[in-house]
Structure formats: C-alpha cells, structure tokens
Amino acid sequence: MSRTWIDIMADSKPDLPDNNKKYRISSKSGILSVLRVMIRNNSQATCYFGDAGSFFPTALLNLDSQRGEMVLDYGPNEEINQQALQVEKWNVVAFPNQVKVQFSCQQIGKTEFEGRNAFLAQIPTSLLRMQKREYYRVATPTTAPVKCVIPLLLGKSPSTVEVLLQDLSCGGMAVIDSNGRSNFEEGSVYENCCIVLPDIGTVNVSMRIIRVEPADTGFVHDLQSQRVSCEFADAGENALSLIQRYITRLELEQKRAS
C-alpha cells in the first residue's frame, strides 16, 4: 500500500515519539472543538490526495456532529474535484491561529451547501494539532534554491539583503548569508521578509533570529558565510498554506528520487 504524505512526515520527524501520539487528539469533543475553530476563523486549508501529490484549496464550512459528517468547500478546478472524488482518503492541512491542524477525510462525496457545490465527508476519528516549534523542517534544494529578501533594521546599510534558504518548515527556516555583513543579531525581529517559493508563489513573513553561526559551505576559504536560524514571528494562514504546499512537493520529489 502506498504511503501518504502524513506517513512520510510522521516517520521523518525525530522529535515526535510514538508516531505522533503526543499531538494526536482522539476524543470527540476535542476534535469538534478544533474543527469549530477552523469554521469560526474561516481557515483556509489544503487537501492532498493520490500518490501524485495532487491538491486543491478548501475550507471547512459546516459540521453535523449528530450524523458525524462535515462539509468542505468545493475546489476551483472541476477536473481536480472529480479526481478527488475517485479516491478513498484525503489529507487536509490547515493553520487556524497559526497552529498546524492535520487530519484525514474518508467516505467522501459531493453535496450542496447554501446553494453551491461542496464536499461531504466523515468527521475524522482523530487529528494532529501541532504548535510552530513542532514542525518538521525539510532541506531546500541547491539546484533550484529558495531565495528570501530581508529588509534590514533602520540605520543598516544596505537596506535589504538576499539570502538562500537551507531548510524550511511552517514554523521557521535556516538561511545562508554569504557575505556575512548583515550583522544579524539573535532575538531581533525582521518584518516583511519576502520568500520566493519556486512554482508556488511569494509569501511575506516576519521572522525572529534564533541563532547565528559560521556556515559550513564546504569551501575551505569561505570565512564570511554565516548560517542564520529563524522562527516565524508572524505568518498568515495563506502564507503557511503556500509554505506547506511547497514542503509537500519537496517531500514527494525526494520520495521519487530515493
């Protein structure tokens, strides 16, 4: 049986013991509470399905706890919607209040909600709820590097610096500052940092510097480069959804190459 992306992520993350049990919610009241927050916040979600890593944007619209059913928004592409209806299980990821929520959908069908097309699925029997510090980081490729433009603090020269990402998660990233002249200080917050995700889009985040250290670039005479570890101080749900889509794509590409 093919492994889902959730299986890949759970296996890859070393600090989540017992197959994510610490972060899994299995009580009916706990599950409904998390899902209601998603509805109340109108949280944007991404639904992944199939071995090819297909996905579409969605949102949780309604819950019927008596029937054990939930309604999800219909995707914008009818061809993808029809493909999604042919599979037995979906994996849904959302970020209400910047907390990662992840669950599987089963018994999926088409319905109508408030006069428009929608999906009907069974309420999950469990879900994962993980804070930012718990996100798994994935190494970004060197062949198609991810770039980030960081506006420096007032009084700094130059006013911006472009760095290359070394790894990325929905909770933060590590970047390589090749010239080492940016004078990043641990604890400083940099706003409106622009990350360009190849074939996905551009996201803007605020980040806090966690650690600055010499970078191991593999070049003997490279004494300037520094590795800067950051956590996201502020990232909207849409930005987190785009980052998650990019991470998922990298995971699938790495799986195919292995």
Swiss-Prot record:
The alphabetized UniProt keywords are: Bacterial flagellum, c-di-GMP, Nucleotide-binding
Domain spans labelled PilZ: 131-248
Record keyword Cell membrane present = no
Localization per record: Bacterial flagellum basal body
TM ranges = none
Q: Which GO terms describe its biological process?
A: bacterial-type flagellum-dependent cell motility; regulation of bacterial-type flagellum-dependent cell motility by regulation of motor speed
Q: Return one GO MF term.
A: cyclic-di-GMP binding
> A Gene Ontology CC term for this entry?
bacterial-type flagellum basal body
InterPro entries tied to this protein: PilZ_domain, Split_barrel_FMN-bd, T3SS_YcgR, T3SS_YcgR_PilZN
Q: What is its main location?
A: other
Tell me, what does this protein do in biology?
Answer: Acts as a flagellar brake, regulating swimming and swarming in a bis-(3'-5') cyclic diguanylic acid (c-di-GMP)-dependent manner. Binds 1 c-di-GMP dimer per subunit. Increasing levels of c-di-GMP lead to decreased motility.
The Swiss-Prot or TrEMBL record describes its family as follows: Belongs to the YcgR family.
How does this chain assemble?
Monomer. Interacts with the flagellar basal bodies.
Q: What is this protein called?
A: Flagellar brake protein YcgR
Native organism: Nitrosospira multiformis (strain ATCC 25196 / NCIMB 11849 / C 71)
Q: What is the lineage of its organism?
A: Bacteria, Pseudomonadati, Pseudomonadota, Betaproteobacteria, Nitrosomonadales
This protein's gene is called: ycgR
